[in-house]
Structure formats: structure tokens, C-alpha cells
């Protein structure tokens, strides 16, 4: 496997599976780097008591929908199975990852610990991680004195349309080569009775 010296940015989709009004995508496109769209289904998360087959089916259906909409840009989301750090380690052997964009996730302890761990790995590997807010939860504030002000400034922002992405995303041809090195997420959903 030959490493590309072309600097890239990665949009790491977590729970925010949308294209429009997605600050992570807008910022990655504005970075003027080639952008790889990534979704990782984590084995540790699937095995967590909070997760069910319905979650997995929703994720798969959302990825199928997003990929259909991304086809006009000659790309799709690289949807892989594995633990996040191992996935980024593999990608860093193939690309010069400069920046990662994702939303600022709030939720369960397992994802909080994962984010702390991957943040450390990004720093050690000189990768800048930009977490974009997509809702009104603000971690780490001591009291609620300024919460209303923070929340209002967040919700008063205009909805951001999908930016122009032609020739700014990793192509299907390149993705075909990348996929050879990963366990891909099967996007077919299971029928539930």
C-alpha cells in the first residue's frame, strides 16, 4: 500500500447523518483539502446495552439515502466496521490526514470515553480535530447562568445549505481502492417482525 502525500480532511459522521445544515461538512469543504466522508460502526458500541438492531437499521438506511444523494458528486460515505482509532490508524497509512471534522457528540459514556481517547491520538499524530456543535448541550459548564445565552446564539444561526462539493470529495474510483483495506459495513437492513 502506497501512502498518498495529498493532504486530506475527513468528515467523521457519528450520530448526525445529514448533508444539509451540517457544519462539519461545510467546514471540511471550506478547508480546500480533498474530503473523505467516513462512518464507523463500532463493535464496542453495537455490543453496548443502549444499542439495538433498530439503531443499526436506521444507520444503514440513512447511509443508503446519503450515498444516493452523494452519487451526483461521484462519491459515497466510506462505511466501515471496527474501532475508531484503528480505522484512523489504517487511513493514516494511506493518506496524509490533516484535519478531521465531526459533530460534538453528547450521549453515553462509551462514546465520551472514545472521543477522549481519539482526541489524544489525533494530537499525537498532528491531526487537527474540529468538533462542530449540532445541538444545545454544552459540556463542562459549571452552572446554567449563561446557558440560555449560549443556546440562543446557537439556535439563532441560519440553516446552512449543502456547499458546492463538485471535485472536492474523494472519488468512487479512489474509494474502491481504499475499501480493499477495511471491513465494510453491509448496508442491507434486517427485517424486523
Residue ranges and their predicted role:
Residues 1-75:
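N-terminal beta-strand-loop-alpha-helix module at the start
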Residues 43-48, 91-98:
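Acidic/His-enriched low-complexity segments
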Residues 78-94:
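Structural beta-alpha unit
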Residues 98-111:
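Acidic beta-strand-to-loop metal/phosphate-binding motif
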Residues 110-134:
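Short acidic, glycine/proline-enriched helix-loop-strand junctions
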Residues 125-127, 146-193:
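Glycine/tryptophan-enriched, flexible segments
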Residues 135-148:
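Glycine-rich, charge-decorated loop segments at or immediately adjacent to ligand/cofactor-binding or catalytic sites
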Amino acid at each position: 500500500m502506497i501512502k498518498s502525500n495529498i493532504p486530506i480532511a475527513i468528515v467523521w459522521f457519528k450520530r448526525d447523518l445529514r448533508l444539509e445544515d451540517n457544519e462539519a461538512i461545510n467546514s471540511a469543504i471550506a478547508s480546500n483539502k480533498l474530503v473523505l466522508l467516513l462512518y464507523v460502526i463500532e463493535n464496542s458500541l453495537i455490543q453496548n446495552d443502549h444499542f439495538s438492531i433498530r439503531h443499526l437499521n436506521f444507520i444503514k438506511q440513512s447511509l443508503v439515502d446519503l450515498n444516493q444523494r452523494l452519487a451526483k458528486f461521484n462519491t459515497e460515505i466510506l462505511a466501515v466496521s471496527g474501532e475508531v482509532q484503528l480505522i484512523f490508524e489504517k487511513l493514516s497509512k494511506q493518506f496524509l490526514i490533516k484535519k478531521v471534522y465531526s459533530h460534538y457528540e453528547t450521549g453515553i459514556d462509551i462514546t465520551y470515553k472514545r472521543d477522549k481517547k481519539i482526541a489524544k491520538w489525533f494530537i499525537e499524530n498532528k491531526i487537527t480535530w474540529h468538533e462542530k456543535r449540532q445541538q444545545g448541550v454544552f459540556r463542562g459548564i459549571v452552572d446554567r447562568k449563561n446557558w440560555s445565552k449560549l443556546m440562543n446564539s446557537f439556535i439563532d444561526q441560519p440553516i446552512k445549505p449543502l456547499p458546492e462539493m463538485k471535485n472536492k470529495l474523494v472519488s468512487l474510483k479512489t474509494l474502491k481502492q481504499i475499501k480493499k483495506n477495511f471491513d465494510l459495513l453491509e448496508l442491507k437492513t434486517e427485517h424486523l417482525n
